A protein has these predicted regions:
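C-terminal segment of N-terminal export signals and the immediately downstream linker at the start
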Residues: 1, 22-51
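Residue-level detector of intrinsically disordered/flexible regions characterized by low predicted structural confidence
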Residues: 11, 29-32, 294-295
């Protein structure tokens, strides 16, 4: 603390002298560049919370086929740099959030193109797997989303198309790439949903059967007060699920899927920060009961802002990751690095979040 005060005092003297007598400053041997560097570096001491007291992010979604996030139009050079930036902060797992949404797809799929999907310009699946191989990361493949679940509320609509996609992808890609490490069942739910248990079970079982038992996971949201439509103007809603009801419904869901779904990464952005511990404790207890891993999907975008969506304030991210550590979660992944945390994101705040994260975790 004494060193910090001394450095800051010297920096103040330098600044004042520069205004009053710049020639003197330039010639002075006592006030030099090293003093200024040390004084500025001492500003790091302004962090007042305990560092590294949170669960670090070790995985990220790759949101190349998005519902509601603007496309960055990156090519392989930008993606290569982004994988390098991920690796630099300890990310070892990348998850393609979905292999397609309605008619837009990520790879040259004979089945989906035959059903009317557009042929993609680039084989993004091959590119992501190649980069994951290069940077020694684990790659999880996200299943296809036809959009019919969102239209009907019945998740079983997604089973048939994914029977073909799972087989096609494993034969064409998974068996060739060392990084292909598992499957993401991409249907998102929050409550007891029509067809959810059957759909998760059928798709999870097929993923495991074709790949020799590679792990699967899901990433539902919690139906909290921030669970509002992204297309609407409201930031919160009156009706939100209670902790007890959340536990009851997810106990039933886990009971029906735990033999073919290995992990659950609940999205953390739909509840308030003072609710994190209560919901996280329930999530971990349920996962332990059914022998599943409990991950957190730590959202790096801010649901509290009227502009949808911008990078989150670091303090909010810290609160969520600290709660995950207190609950004993197994892993933290994020939605998602490339838009909201990357130094090369279209949002300048994302690079600042990256730097604050590195400071906190002393990377």
């Amino acid at each position: 603390m004494g060193d910090r005060r001394r450095f800051l005092k010297e920096l103040a003297m330098v600044s004042a002298a520069a205004v009053v007598a710049p020639d003197i400053v330039a010639k002075s041997s006592n006030v030099n560049e090293k003093t200024v560097r040390e004084a500025v570096r001492a500003a790091d001491d302004f962090m007042i919370v305990e560092r590294k007291n949170a669960l670090p992010i070790t995985g990220t979604f790759l949101d190349e086929i998005s519902h509601d996030i603007p496309h960055q139009n990156w090519g392989v050079q930008q993606w290569d740099a982004d994988f390098r930036n991920m690796k630099a902060i300890g990310i070892d797992t990348v998850i393609m959030i979905r292999s397609g949404y309605r008619k837009f797809i990520t790879y040259d799929s004979p089945y989906l193109i035959g059903k009317g999907c557009y042929r993609p310009t680039y084989d993004l699946l091959e590119m992501f797997l190649t980069l994951a191989d290069k940077y020694d990361m684990k790659f999880y493949f996200g299943l296809y989303d036809s959009g019919r679940y969102w239209d009907t509320g019945d998740l079983t609509w997604e089973i048939e198309d994914n029977k073909h996609v799972i087989e096609e992808v494993w034969q064409g890609y998974g068996s060739r790439h060392k990084s292909f490490a598992g499957w993401y069942i991409s249907g998102e739910i929050s409550r007891a949903t029509r067809g959810a248990i059957r759909a998760f079970h059928d798709m999870g079982k097929q993923c495991k059967d074709v790949s020799g038992g590679l792990p699967t996971f899901i990433s539902p949201w919690i139906d909290g007060k921030k669970a509002v439509m992204a297309s609407g103007s409201a930031l919160t809603k009156e009706e939100a699920v209670s902790v007890a009801q959340h536990e009851k419904e997810w106990d039933e869901i886990f009971d029906g899927i735990h033999d073919v779904v290995d992990a659950c990464a609940f999205q953390d952005g739909h509840i308030d920060y003072d609710e994190l511990d209560a919901f996280f404790e329930v999530n971990k207890r349920l996962a332990d009961r059914y022998g599943m891993q409990c991950w957190t999907n730590a959202e790096t975008f801010d649901r509290d802002m009227p502009i949808k969506f911008l990078p989150i304030k670091f303090e909010k991210l810290r609160l969520k990751l600290e709660a995950a550590k207190r609950a004993g979660y197994d892993k933290a992944i994020t939605f998602e690095f490339s838009h909201f945390m990357s130094p090369q994101s279209a949002y300048i705040q994302a690079g600042n979040l990256y730097n604050r994260y590195k400071e906190y975790f002393e990377i």
